[in-house]
């Protein structure tokens, strides 16, 4: 489901959220005449997980500011190709190719490039003895938030996200599709933690929200026997 419509016939997350708010009584049809709730944090197409929706003018403004100022801590979970032994923070420069709807990651800045930082921590591994089949499950902290950042950044260091049609390896993607019915990149927006907040968002101050892993992710974990060696970033 897209956060916003790409085509008139699409059903968007915005519409889903509005429908939920109407059914729950948190919003009326009359309210929609002056304001329509909207998603504050967008995910890449076919990335699962948490999105935040502002259901009032003030709430949307404050939420959008928190995400814009990068004071909301955002954590993702992913399964990547290869073995990653230790966590680290990687940096680079992202350049968009609008014609191809892809990005490139460079070591040095060029005109129109955007600096990016991505922090990852290994959570578990799987290996069948063939190094070409190794998998690592990672926790990702998105320090900067650019379109395709996590997927392209990890691919640029030789650890593509499993199932990724843009930045992944086709032969391995075919394997995950055949064995586990994976039809997308295995990237999940797992957790967000809010900073100290005031005003209309005071009730969110310091709170953490988690989204359960989707079925395709769990099928790969179970089928490949990925062994978890530590917990995700602890909830407050």
Each model region followed by its residue ranges:
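A generic structural signal for short beta-strands and their flanking turns/coil linkers
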Residues: 72-76, 86, 90, 116-118, ...
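Short histidine-centered loop motifs in beta-beta connectors
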Residues: 138-141
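Loop/turn elements at beta-strand to alpha-helix junctions within RNA-recognition modules
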Residues: 57, 143-144
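RNA pseudouridine synthases
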Residues: 1-100, 109-114, 124-127, 131, ...
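Pseudouridine synthases involved in rRNA/tRNA modification
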Residues: 110-111, 128-133, 143, 153-236
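Residue-level signal for inorganic ion chemistry
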Residues: 52, 78, 120, 150, ...
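Short beta-strand segments enriched for Tyr within beta-sheet-rich domains
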Residues: 63, 146-154
């Amino acid at each position: 489901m897209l956060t916003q419509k790409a085509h008139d016939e699409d059903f968007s997350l915005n519409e889903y959220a509005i429908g939920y708010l109407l059914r729950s009584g948190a919003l009326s049809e009359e309210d929609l005449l002056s304001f329509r709730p909207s998603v504050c944090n967008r995910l890449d197409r076919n990335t699962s997980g948490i999105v935040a929706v502002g259901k009032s003018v003030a709430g949307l403004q404050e939420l959008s500011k928190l995400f814009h100022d990068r004071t909301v801590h955002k954590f993702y979970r992913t399964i990547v190709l290869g073995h990653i032994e230790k966590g680290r923070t990687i940096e680079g420069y992202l350049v968009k190719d609008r014609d191809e709807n892809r990005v490139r990651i460079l070591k040095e800045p060029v005109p129109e490039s955007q600096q990016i930082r991505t922090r990852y921590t290994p959570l578990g591994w799987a290996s069948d003895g063939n190094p070409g089949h190794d998998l690592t499950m990672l926790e990702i902290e998105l320090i900067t938030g650019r379109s395709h950042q996590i997927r392209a950044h990890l691919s640029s260091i030789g650890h593509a996200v499993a199932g990724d049609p843009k930045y992944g390896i086709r032969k391995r993607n075919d394997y995950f599709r055949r064995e586990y019915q994976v039809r997308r990149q295995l990237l999940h927006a797992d957790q967000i933690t809010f900073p100290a907040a005031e005003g209309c968002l005071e009730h969110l101050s310091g709170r953490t929200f988690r989204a359960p892993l989707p079925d395709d992710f769990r099928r790969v974990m179970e089928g490949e026997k990925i062994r978890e060696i530590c917990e995700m970033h602890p909830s407050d």
